[in-house]
Swiss-Prot record:
Stretches the record annotates as Disordered: 1-33, 103-164, 292-334
Tissue: Mostly expressed in rosettes (e.g. young leaves), flowers (e.g. styles), siliques and inflorescence.
Function, as annotated: Putative transcription factor. Probably involved in establishing polarity during leaf development through the gibberellic acid (GA) signaling pathway.
Quaternary data: Homo- and heterodimer with other ZFHD proteins. Interacts with MIF1, MIF2 and MIF3; these interactions prevent nuclear localization and DNA-binding to inhibit transcription regulation activity. Binds to ZHD1, ZHD2, ZHD4, ZHD5, ZHD6, ZHD7 and ZHD8. Interacts with KIN10 and KIN11.
Keywords: DNA-binding, Gibberellin signaling pathway, Homeobox, Metal-binding, Nucleus, Transcription, Transcription regulation, Zinc, Zinc-finger
Protein name listed in UniProt: Zinc-finger homeodomain protein 10
Organism: Arabidopsis thaliana
Domain description: The homeodomain differs form the typical one by having namely 4 instead of 3 extra amino acids inserted in the loop between helix 1 and helix 2.
Site (Required for DNA-binding) location in chain: M252
Length: 334
């Protein structure tokens, strides 16, 4: 009895326990290997579900980029062409639109989306910028994300290009037309202001000759000023001739100096005619012949003087004879 128990314990116990830890150690090492790599979660999906991880939806290629517009061909989903080869990335073109697969929007698979909350491209962009992949990743995400918000309905490529190019031109035309309208509105506004100011300056009331004479007489009577004591007279006068009070006031202000200058000029002309050169007008009539000169004519009477030139000789015809009797023709010189 004593000999059998130790033999059983020594032979049986070590043998089953030794392979167990050996089998457990590789199982623990295997999950540690993918975790040691960067982005192990993404790599795990690439290993198992690479063809099912992403689905390529509508085409996002801008066919009007050269024209400065934005036009899509309307392809709703990527369909690999029969000539595409998985080993050759350049051959992955869509059979519907002919564009490369990279132009289509990449959408994560719905089955894997529940287990993986953040999308793989975002995690790759978050972890890799710190190392050496910072420049390449940013360009691809903006084109897929920006058109996602406003993706047009699937329309054929030719109609889409024509319609969007037309709308682009229309938008440009509308923008230019709105600019023209805005500038035209501003010009009209300024022109309207100028016309308002210009209308105040250029608006002139046309008066009849009767109104001008009456206003001139009234202005002379009032003294070319409108005073409070003359308000009743001004009101009655304006009602008589059919002129507004403000118009009469402006007319008096504008013509005050004009008529004063005319009066001053008329007075100067009268002074020159009357007293400037001591020239008195010669009137035909009865003239008393007082000759202090060389020739005297006797036998006075009514003399009719005919003056041939001012200051020259004059011929006198006498009705009654002079010293010699009969008609005497005399010449006098001053």
């Amino acid at each position: 009895m004593m000999d059998m128990t130790p033999t059983i314990t020594t032979t049986t116990t070590p043998t089953p326990k030794s392979p167990e830890p050996e089998s457990e150690t590789p199982t623990r090492i295997q999950p540690a290997k993918p975790i040691s790599f960067s982005n192990g979660i993404i790599k795990r999906h690439h290993h198992h579900h690479h063809p099912l991880l992403f689905t390529y939806k509508e085409c996002l290629k801008n066919h009007a980029a050269a024209l400065g517009g934005h036009a899509l061909d309307g392809c709703g989903e990527f369909m690999p062409s029969p000539s595409s080869i998985s080993s050759d990335p350049t051959s992955l073109k869509c059979a519907a639109c002919g564009c490369h697969r990279n132009f289509h929007r990449r959408d994560p698979d719905n089955n894997n989306d529940s287990s993986q909350i953040p999308p793989p491209p975002s995690t790759a962009v978050e972890y890799q910028p710190h190392h050496r992949h910072h420049p390449p990743p940013p360009p691809p995400p903006p084109p897929p994300r920006s058109p996602n918000s406003a993706s047009p309905p699937p329309i054929s490529s030719s109609y889409m290009l024509l319609s969007l190019s037309g709308t682009n031109n229309n938008n440009n035309n509308l923008a230019s037309f709105s600019d023209l309208n805005f500038s035209a509105g501003n010009n009209h506004h300024h022109h309207h202001q100028h016309t308002l100011h210009g209308s105040r300056k250029r608006f002139r009331t046309k008066f009849s000759q009767f109104q001008k004479e009456k206003m001139h007489e009234f202005a002379e009577r009032v003294g070319w000023k409108m005073q409070k004591r003359d308000e009743d007279d001004v009101r009655d006068f304006c009602r008589q001739i059919g002129v507004d009070k403000s118009v009469l006031k402006v007319w008096m202000h504008n013509n005050k100096n004009t008529f004063n200058r005319r009066d001053i000029a008329g007075n100067e002309i009268r002074q020159i005619d009357n007293g400037g050169g001591n020239h008195t007008p010669i009137l035909a009539g009865e003239i008393n012949n007082h000759n202090n000169g060389h020739h005297g004519v006797g036998g006075g009477g009514e003399l009719h003087q005919s003056v041939s030139s001012g200051g020259g000789g004059g011929g006198f015809d006498s009705d009654s004879g002079g010293a010699n009797g009969g008609n005497v023709n005399g010449s006098s010189s001053s």
